[in-house]
């Protein structure tokens, strides 16, 4: 399951992300954070952490460096 989710994120990074404006307020980017979280915590907890990160990545957030 981990590899499947990571593959989906990499497909997003390769095909969808280049068509969108750069808007991530954090480093690493939200998609890179998601991959790192899934690798570190597994599919369930890593995905939940990634979703929480994506919800925090908005115009009202200061952003900054945030590693999983």
From Swiss-Prot:
Superkingdom of this protein's organism: Bacteria
Compartments reported by the entry: Cell inner membrane
Name of a matching Pfam family: YidD
Topological type in the membrane: Peripheral membrane protein
NCBIfam families: membrane protein insertion efficiency factor YidD
Function: Could be involved in insertion of integral membrane proteins into the membrane.
Protein name as annotated: Putative membrane protein insertion efficiency factor
């Amino acid at each position: 399951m981990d590899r499947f989710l990571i593959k989906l994120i990499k497909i997003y990074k390769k095909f969808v992300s280049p068509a969108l404006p750069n808007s991530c307020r954090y480093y690493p980017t939200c998609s890179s954070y998601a991959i790192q979280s899934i690798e570190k915590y597994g599919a369930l907890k890593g995905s939940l952490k990634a979703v929480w990160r994506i919800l925090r990545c908005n115009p009202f957030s200061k952003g900054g460096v945030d590693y999983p």
